[in-house]
Amino acid sequence: MPELPEVETVRRGLETLVLGQEIVAVTLKVPKMVKTDLETFALTLPGQIIQSVGRRGKYLLIDLGQLVLVSHLRMEGKYLLFPDEVPDNKHFHVFFELKNGSTLVYQDVRKFGTFDLIAKSQLSAFFAKRKLGPEPKKETFKLKTFEAALLSSQKPIKPHLLDQTLVAGLGNIYVDEVLWAAKVHPETASSRLNKAEIKRLHDETIRILALGIEKGGSTVRTYRNALGADGTMQDYLQVYGQTGKPCPRCGQAIVKLKVGGRGTHICPKCQKKRL
């Protein structure tokens, strides 16, 4: 699943490709992807001009002025821009024809991606309803708020970080990286974390997601950015996908286990499980 660094990289690519373009026609082949009114989606988008492309957590925000098209890539969604003819592909599901003759295509092998067309004035309420946490930046991701939320919960720390309420944008790859960097076992109850561990989790979340953005995201399975290029963050992953390899910190073999139903990579020496 594209996580915050991948979505931010897609955002930057889209802004380069389609900023200022007018949508002249929309073709939707998988109606279930649109979570707001289908007729409004089909009739309102033509004539709209893409004024900016933003992001909130893992959501892309295509700013159309008074309206915002909120796009979530889910597991394998991606955008491609074709300057003229669009090739046949059974995984192309949404087609945005632009005034300059190009077509922005949404591709999704698993058809899990979603679109919500909402008034810009409703954007805050949209994310509040989903209890989306702050962006992972020093200015918005406050240590004391993070600490209070952790200490009041019995949830294991990995599922807690994944649920998007503590901080927006973490997925399976980057949670494993953050937990390893902070020397925290993924099954540790949130309330049992000490202040030093909480600070490390906070600081490493900011650092690692920023690094992921800098490296253009992780191409682990099928991720490509909007320009069709791979990311390079996979070359900097310390534990995710490194089963059997030596821990970069202590040399112990990385192991893979299941936490909350998710494949999880840890160093059993650096990330000791509490009894």
Swiss-Prot record:
Its cofactor is Zn(2+). InterPro entries: DNA_glyclase/AP_lyase_DNA-bd, DNA_glyclase_Znf_dom_DNA_BS, Formamido-pyr_DNA_Glyclase, FPG_cat, MutM-like_N-ter, Ribosomal_uS13-like_H2TH, Znf_DNA_glyclase/AP_lyase, Znf_FPG/IleRS. It holds the Pfam family H2TH. One of its GO terms (molecular function) is class I DNA-(apurinic or apyrimidinic site) endonuclease activity. CDD domains: EcFpg-like_N. Signal peptide: none annotated. Coiled coil: none annotated. A zinc finger (FPG-type) spans 238-272. It comes from the Bacteria. DNA binds at H91, R110. Binds 1 zinc ion per subunit. The active site is at P2, E3, K58, R262. GO terms for biological process: base-excision repair. It catalyses: Hydrolysis of DNA containing ring-opened 7-methylguanine residues, releasing 2,6-diamino-4-hydroxy-5-(N-methyl)formamidopyrimidine; 2'-deoxyribonucleotide-(2'-deoxyribose 5'-phosphate)-2'-deoxyribonucleotide-DNA = a 3'-end 2'-deoxyribonucleotide-(2,3-dehydro-2,3-deoxyribose 5'-phosphate)-DNA + a 5'-end 5'-phospho-2'-deoxyribonucleoside-DNA + H(+). Belongs to the FPG family. PANTHER family: FORMAMIDOPYRIMIDINE-DNA GLYCOSYLASE. Involved in base excision repair of DNA damaged by oxidation or by mutagenic agents. Acts as a DNA glycosylase that recognizes and removes damaged bases. Has a preference for oxidized purines, such as 7,8-dihydro-8-oxoguanine (8-oxoG). Has AP (apurinic/apyrimidinic) lyase activity and introduces nicks in the DNA strand. Cleaves the DNA backbone by beta-delta elimination to generate a single-strand break at the site of the removed base with both 3'- and 5'-phosphates. Monomer. This is Formamidopyrimidine-DNA glycosylase.
